[in-house]
Amino acid sequence: MLRKISLFMLFTIVWSYQKFQMLIPNGDAVPNPCAGQSGIWGGVGHNVAAGGGLNNQFGLDFNSSGKVWTPEFCQKDSDQDGKSNGFELGDADCKWTPGGTPEGIATGHPGVCEPMNSSKCQQVNKNITCSPSNYT
């Protein structure tokens, strides 16, 4: 019984992130910005790559936009690194719509200030967790 509950919870979590990933351009291909790590940051709106727990500023802004990719949300710089959310997600012109193909690839993480080792970004990223166990 415990195994069934665990599998159900895992499926629910994975499905939830996939659902949200489809609502932003390249949501399933956001690069992991942590030094020495590679792969995809699956929980784009969260402080840990695997998702869950607290939202990062991008996740908070996503919720504030009604979970809709709007021109305003696209043009916003949620992580304060000088690059708009759209630019980092491959939609610099903010023309992407769900189900469409973004004009480019995701070049950064819209919820993690980069470069992470800069003094500005270290302060902005104080709640971001870079731990290998958190990556997908």
Language-model segments: residues:
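Calcium-binding acidic motifs and repeat modules
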Residues: L2-Q80, G86-T136
